[in-house]
């Protein structure tokens, strides 16, 4: 069938076209089927149908397909029915509880990266992986496929270190301290981090307050080789590109299949050339891993996958039932991290976790004797070497190396919530705390953050400040404070949670 091309400057994430329902019927295709669009070049695209947007005799072509085929408006193209990718049948195989082969897994991941699958097909794969879990072979094959379908970095010097946290704990700013400590010891650490999806700020969001974080894979290698480390946003690279597309499906479904968690983390680390890693697994109420028992099992799974990939993995089960440190979100978190590097001061939870994990990495990297890593980490901070290295990393990433903790901007709209009575703080809700921060504008508004004046187990008097919230916009601050009063993030003993009266 001959149709006239009509461009649409809309990104849809794949090759996609839209044709009139009458033309679709004549072609024998339905919405979700594929067609070949032929001009000087040929592409295969997913079909959408319409009764109104595109008139008969025309074909609407979205940006990705338009840029690939390079036709001009109203140019006549040939449109023919095309078969679905073979990977669709492999997805159906997983839905039927069958084990996939290495080749089948690679085909699925390749089609995800190339945009050859519809949202329905990708969702089917993610859901099937969640319901019918993958075995160790499938997880390894998925990891390798995610690496092969994106950019990879290799270094001439080894070991190449990395650190990753499963997440779920507000205030987990330790990457900003760990990366310069490890690099100051002479080890390489090309740290790629994520932005917050449901949290108040990921490591990349925090680092972006100090310097740019969006770099290509070759730039990451160059910066790491020059100063020993970097802390960048993984989403700006083409490293394991299938991961972001899978996450986009998982998020609205509120699922995180273990197989894809393992593959996602390990593919990104393997692709940047890391061969030695410490994995932080926070456990506790309102974290991703509620119990230590579940944490141990996840640790074993990661270590087994590391063995299969030739990576040395050690895991740290950490307490995640309460925020790390006293600063959560944006500039206040960055300030707290920098104060630790500047003065070796700060909340005990931040100091202890940073030093413990850094010590593990220094021992694994071979620069500290067994059981001496933590001592070396402390010396690197107290001597100023870690701070100097952090400034070098900031500079190589395009930031101001003269920045100090008191120069980091925070929101100028401020409110403090007071305790309604005397008593001990019994609980801090991680989820409510994060929700309040997001209502205040985090992670988009970099000035948003919370300072906790009291933590779990501490005594508070009536009228004392429980926490202070900073924001960039007054109306967002008001919305967040109102929410915190309706659903308190802190429970002080003796507080009435809800009053129920006779009507």
Curated annotation (Swiss-Prot):
<dbReference type="Pfam" id="PF02885">
    <property type="entry name" value="Glycos_trans_3N"/>
</dbReference>
<dbReference type="InterPro" id="IPR035902">
    <property type="entry name" value="Nuc_phospho_transferase"/>
</dbReference>
<dbReference type="GO" id="GO:0046125">
    <property type="term" value="P:pyrimidine deoxyribonucleoside metabolic process"/>
</dbReference>
<feature type="binding site">
    <location>
        <position position="264"/>
    </location>
    <ligand>
        <name>AMP</name>
    </ligand>
</feature>
<feature type="binding site">
    <location>
        <position position="203"/>
    </location>
    <ligand>
        <name>AMP</name>
    </ligand>
</feature>
<dbReference type="GO" id="GO:0006196">
    <property type="term" value="P:AMP catabolic process"/>
</dbReference>
<dbReference type="Pfam" id="PF00591">
    <property type="entry name" value="Glycos_transf_3"/>
</dbReference>
<dbReference type="GO" id="GO:0016763">
    <property type="term" value="F:pentosyltransferase activity"/>
</dbReference>
<dbReference type="InterPro" id="IPR017713">
    <property type="entry name" value="AMP_phosphorylase"/>
</dbReference>
<dbReference type="GO" id="GO:0005829">
    <property type="term" value="C:cytosol"/>
</dbReference>
<dbReference type="InterPro" id="IPR017459">
    <property type="entry name" value="Glycosyl_Trfase_fam3_N_dom"/>
</dbReference>
<keyword id="KW-0808">Transferase</keyword>
<dbReference type="InterPro" id="IPR036566">
    <property type="entry name" value="PYNP-like_C_sf"/>
</dbReference>
<dbReference type="InterPro" id="IPR000053">
    <property type="entry name" value="Thymidine/pyrmidine_PPase"/>
</dbReference>
<feature type="active site" description="Proton donor">
    <location>
        <position position="256"/>
    </location>
</feature>
<dbReference type="InterPro" id="IPR000312">
    <property type="entry name" value="Glycosyl_Trfase_fam3"/>
</dbReference>
<keyword id="KW-0328">Glycosyltransferase</keyword>
<dbReference type="GO" id="GO:0004645">
    <property type="term" value="F:1,4-alpha-oligoglucan phosphorylase activity"/>
</dbReference>
<dbReference type="Pfam" id="PF07831">
    <property type="entry name" value="PYNP_C"/>
</dbReference>
<dbReference type="GO" id="GO:0006206">
    <property type="term" value="P:pyrimidine nucleobase metabolic process"/>
</dbReference>
<feature type="binding site">
    <location>
        <position position="168"/>
    </location>
    <ligand>
        <name>AMP</name>
    </ligand>
</feature>
<dbReference type="InterPro" id="IPR013466">
    <property type="entry name" value="Thymidine/AMP_Pase"/>
</dbReference>
<feature type="binding site">
    <location>
        <begin position="194"/>
        <end position="199"/>
    </location>
    <ligand>
        <name>AMP</name>
    </ligand>
</feature>
<dbReference type="GO" id="GO:0016208">
    <property type="term" value="F:AMP binding"/>
</dbReference>
<protein>
    <recommendedName>
        <fullName>AMP phosphorylase</fullName>
        <ecNumber>2.4.2.57</ecNumber>
    </recommendedName>
</protein>
<dbReference type="InterPro" id="IPR036320">
    <property type="entry name" value="Glycosyl_Trfase_fam3_N_dom_sf"/>
</dbReference>
<feature type="binding site">
    <location>
        <position position="288"/>
    </location>
    <ligand>
        <name>AMP</name>
    </ligand>
</feature>
<dbReference type="InterPro" id="IPR013102">
    <property type="entry name" value="PYNP_C"/>
</dbReference>
<comment type="similarity">
    <text>Belongs to the thymidine/pyrimidine-nucleoside phosphorylase family. Type 2 subfamily.</text>
</comment>
<comment type="function">
    <text>Catalyzes the conversion of AMP and phosphate to adenine and ribose 1,5-bisphosphate (R15P). Exhibits phosphorylase activity toward CMP and UMP in addition to AMP. Functions in an archaeal AMP degradation pathway, together with R15P isomerase and RubisCO.</text>
</comment>
């Amino acid at each position: 069938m001959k149709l006239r091309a009509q461009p649409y400057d809309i990104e849809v994430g794949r090759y996609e076209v839209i044709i009139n329902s009458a033309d679709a019927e004549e072609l024998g295709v339905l919405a979700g089927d594929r067609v070949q669009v032929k001009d000087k070049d040929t592409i295969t695209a997913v079909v959408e149908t319409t009764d109104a947007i595109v008139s008969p005799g025309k074909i609407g072509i979205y940006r990705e397909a338009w840029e690939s085929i390079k036709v001009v408006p109203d140019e006549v193209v040939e449109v023919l029915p095309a078969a679905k990718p073979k990977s669709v049948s492999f997805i159906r195989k997983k839905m039927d509880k069958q084990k996939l082969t290495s080749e089948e897994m690679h085909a699925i991941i390749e089609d995800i990266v190339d945009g050859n699958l519809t949202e329905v097909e990708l969702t089917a794969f993610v859901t099937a992986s969640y319901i019918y879990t993958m075995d160790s072979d499938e997880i390894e094959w998925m990891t390798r496929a995610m690496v092969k379908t994106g950019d990879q970095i290799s270094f001439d010097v080894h070991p190449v270190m990395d650190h990753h946290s499963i997440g779920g704990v507000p205030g987990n700013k330790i990457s900003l301290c760990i990366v310069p400590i490890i690099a100051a010891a002479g080890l390489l650490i090309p740290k790629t981090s994520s932005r917050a999806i449901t949290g108040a700020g990921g490591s990349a969001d925090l680092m972006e307050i100090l310097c740019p974080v969006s770099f290509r894979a070759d730039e990451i290698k160059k910066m790491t080789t020059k100063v020993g480390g970097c802390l960048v946003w993984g989403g700006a690279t083409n490293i394991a590109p299938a991961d972001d597309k899978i996450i986009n499906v998982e998020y609205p479904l509120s699922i995180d299949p273990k197989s894809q968690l393992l593959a996602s983390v390990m593919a990104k680390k393997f692709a940047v050339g890391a061969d030695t890693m410490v994995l932080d697994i926070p456990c506790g109420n309102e974290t991703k891993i509620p119990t230590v028992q579940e944490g141990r099992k996840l640790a074993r799974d990661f270590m087994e996958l590391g063995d299969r990939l030739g990576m040395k993995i050690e895991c740290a089960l950490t307490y995640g039932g309460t925020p790390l440190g006293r600063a959560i979100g944006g500039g206040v978190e960055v300030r707290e991290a920098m104060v630790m590097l500047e003065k070796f001061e700060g909340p005990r939870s931040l100091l202890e976790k940073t030093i413990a994990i850094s010590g593990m990495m220094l021992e694994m990297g071979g620069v500290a004797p067994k059981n001496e890593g933590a001592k070396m980490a402390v010396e690197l901070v107290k001597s100023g070497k870690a701070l100097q290295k952090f400034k070098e990393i900031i500079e190589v990433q395009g930031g101001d190396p003269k920045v100090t903790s008191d120069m980091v901007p925070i929101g100028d709209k401020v409110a403090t919530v007071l305790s309604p009575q005397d008593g001990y703080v019994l609980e801090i809700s991680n989820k409510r705390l994060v929700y309040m921060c997001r209502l205040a504008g985090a992670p988009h508004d970099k000035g948003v953050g919370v300072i906790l004046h009291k933590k779990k187990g501490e005594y508070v008097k009536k009228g004392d400040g429980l926490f202070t919230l900073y924001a960039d916009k007054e109306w967002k601050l008001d919305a967040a404070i109102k929410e915190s009063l309706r659903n308190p993030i802190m429970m002080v003993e003796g507080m009435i949670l809800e009053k129920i009266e006779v009507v």
